[in-house]
């Protein structure tokens, strides 16, 4: 696999109130091309939108790929790279025996990741990373649309 086969993705979630109306956005770059994705939910949380952005971006790819996935959510990155094995081993319970929040999204995200080779990168949000800023703008667009603003 060459560098031109590499796909780079930035994802972000947004929520107006938490919970409240929210949106998700993703920027996908490959071989000189770009694709923007976004959507929203009228009643959600920021974490759910962060997770949805990753799921939607990965599910938009039509073949197994080598991906650099840039996220500004340590919740998403750590959840999939550190915590999920323990949650599954413990019957989807946290270390303090409480049910894992957003279990259905964790399961969907894990499934979406299976066919890809992913390098997870945490980027600081609102700090000038061009891809992250674009994903943030898309997430805000998704939020605005579910709130009835265009």
Curated annotation (Swiss-Prot):
It is found in: Cytoplasm. Mg(2+) 2 binds at residues 12, 136. Residues 3-144 form the RNase H type-1 domain. Keywords: Cytoplasm, Endonuclease, Hydrolase, Magnesium, Metal-binding, Nuclease. One of its GO terms (cellular component) is cytoplasm. Binds 1 Mg(2+) ion per subunit. May bind a second metal ion at a regulatory site, or after substrate binding. GO terms for molecular function: magnesium ion binding; nucleic acid binding; RNA-DNA hybrid ribonuclease activity. Residues 129-150 are annotated as: Disordered. CDD domains: RNase_HI_prokaryote_like. PANTHER family: RIBONUCLEASE H1. Monomer. This is Ribonuclease H.
